């Protein structure tokens, strides 16, 4: 068999890996005082270089297949890869100002997690999907615990590790059953086998195959925090350092969705997807309703965003039943809008933390508009985006998902979207109202905490980018949506 080494399509992954190794070498060879800035420059540079290499793949200018079909860096992979790299870039900026002893390891792990996420979008083989899941998971397990003084972070990391290991077992067992039924781990081969199961208008697939696909969906649903596999999310979001929570909220959801789309496009013929994937639609409905409803009683902003993420995972599943061009482009658009809004909210938390205040407590948001008017306005815009109020990207994203659901006949998830949006509007408006409530006493810094202006400045930059992105996606939906449709037309 001839060697099929297409390093052109592997370049984005290699750039991230090289950046991580460079950061570790800088820490090994030079004094910390001289390389703090260069480490962040190296991390940002690695992400930008990886994005640069994805652009030709977006344009379709390079052969997307390599390594005997195990890696498929086509336009689909490029679209989701750019979304993931954008999340990684903003997370690096949010991380500026971490304590001395963990900077190099933290940044290297962040790049390796991003590498695993991008790999999932370009997976052409079941084992590559598993490799991507494990690469991002192992990095995140450690990143969550990167808060030496906080026992909550260690507890969150342990919970995520234990439950993540169980989810990985479901995933690999499902892959084993699919392999046994289809006789191949290649997604292309699985697609051919799935079509061969069709006879006389019926899909006569075996039980092992159905169970295998179901178990694989369970493993990926855990990463997306779909009900009932969401139990880890609130505690992990609350306990993890804020930049890690922000990165997880966007990155794991986007990467797991990309892998799920890859798998289901291959494993289930499109004509049979609405009926075969009905249980997934029910899980999506449950996720929307639980995420929106339980958020009402939250007093911690990070836990609130965890339940928001659960609901938004359900929204993404609206693109699954048809898995056509409309669904995939709508999901990519909504992920970008959700990513900007979510990253911006966590930037506000980070700004408060830079002032020595516990930014995750909703009570500390009281009077935010009067202490910092532009931060308060940005927070309002971001939550309007999460609700889906025009002219924000969230409105356009939900509208496109609704269209995809109607065309795919997914009435269950469409009903969930309408009901949960109304409930979550109450939750998010309550947060906005808190920020615009006058108070005579400003929140005081916690004991032992001191203001850190550089961290605040970096978080303000992220907040400005996130707010601008939310508005641009709402004001100029046509060009962006058409660009995504063109890019995903060959999926």
Curated annotation (Swiss-Prot):
Reactions accelerated catalytically: a quinone + NADH + 5 H(+)(in) = a quinol + NAD(+) + 4 H(+)(out)
A GO CC term assigned to this protein in UniProt: plasma membrane
NCBIfam families noted in UniProt: NDH_I_N (TIGR01770)
Species annotation: Symbiobacterium thermophilum (strain DSM 24528 / JCM 14929 / IAM 14863 / T)
Family the UniProt entry places it in: Belongs to the complex I subunit 2 family.
Pfam family, one: Proton_antipo_M
InterPro entries in the record: NADH-Q_OxRdtase_suN/2, ND/Mrp_TM
Protein name: NADH-quinone oxidoreductase subunit N 1
């Amino acid at each position: 068999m001839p060697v099929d080494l297409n390093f052109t399509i592997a370049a984005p992954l290699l750039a991230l890996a090289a950046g991580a190794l460079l950061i570790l070498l800088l820490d090994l060879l030079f004094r910390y005082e001289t390389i703090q800035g260069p480490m962040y420059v190296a991390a940002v540079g690695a992400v930008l270089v990886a994005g640069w290499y994805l652009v030709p793949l977006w344009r379709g200018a390079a052969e997307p297949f390599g390594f005997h079909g195990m890696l498929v860096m086509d336009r689909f992979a490029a679209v989701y890869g750019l979304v993931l790299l954008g999340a990684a870039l903003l997370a690096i900026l949010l991380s500026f100002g971490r304590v001395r002893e963990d900077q190099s390891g933290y940044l290297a792990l962040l790049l390796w997690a991003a590498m695993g996420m991008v790999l999932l979008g370009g997976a052409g083989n079941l084992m590559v999907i598993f490799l991507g899941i494990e690469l991002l998971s192992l990095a995140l397990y450690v990143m969550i615990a990167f808060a030496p003084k906080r026992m909550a972070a260690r507890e969150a990391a342990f919970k995520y590790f234990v439950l993540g290991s169980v989810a990985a077992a479901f995933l690999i067992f499902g892959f084993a059953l699919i392999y046994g039924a289809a006789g191949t781990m290649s997604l292309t081969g699985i697609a051919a086998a799935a079509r061969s199961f069709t006879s006389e208008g019926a899909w006569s697939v075996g039980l092992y195959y159905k169970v295998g696909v179901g178990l694989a969906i369970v493993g990926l649903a855990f990463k997306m925090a779909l009900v009932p596999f969401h139990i880890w999310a609130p505690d992990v979001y609350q306990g993890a350092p804020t930049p890690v929570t922000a990165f997880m909220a966007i990155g794991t959801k986007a990467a797991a969705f990309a892998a799920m789309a890859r798998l289901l496009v291959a494993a289930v013929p499109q004509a049979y997807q609405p009926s075969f994937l009905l249980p997934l639609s029910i899980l999506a409905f449950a996720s929307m309703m639980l995420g929106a409803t339980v958020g009402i009683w939250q007093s911690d902003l990070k836990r609130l965003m965890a339940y928001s993420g659960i609901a938004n995972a359900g929204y993404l599943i609206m693109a699954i039943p048809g898995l056509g061009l409309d669904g995939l482009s709508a999901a990519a658009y909504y992920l970008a809008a959700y990513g900007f809004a979510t990253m911006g909210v966590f930037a506000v938390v980070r700004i408060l933390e830079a002032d020595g205040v516990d930014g995750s407590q909703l009570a500390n948001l009281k009077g935010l508009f009067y202490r910092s008017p532009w931060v308060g306005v940005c927070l309002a815009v971001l939550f309007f985006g999460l609700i889906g109020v025009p002219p924000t990207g969230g409105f356009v994203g939900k509208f496109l998902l609704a269209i995809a659901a109607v065309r795919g006949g997914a009435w269950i998830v469409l009903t969930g979207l309408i009901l949960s949006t109304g409930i979550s509007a109450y939750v998010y408006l309550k947060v906005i109202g808190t920020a615009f409530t006058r108070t005579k006493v400003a929140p005081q810094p916690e004991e032992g905490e001191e203001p850190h202006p550089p961290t605040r400045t970096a978080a303000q930059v992220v907040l400005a980018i996130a707010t601008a992105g939310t508005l641009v996606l709402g004001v100029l939906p046509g060009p962006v949506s058409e660009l995504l449709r063109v890019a995903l037309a060959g999926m």
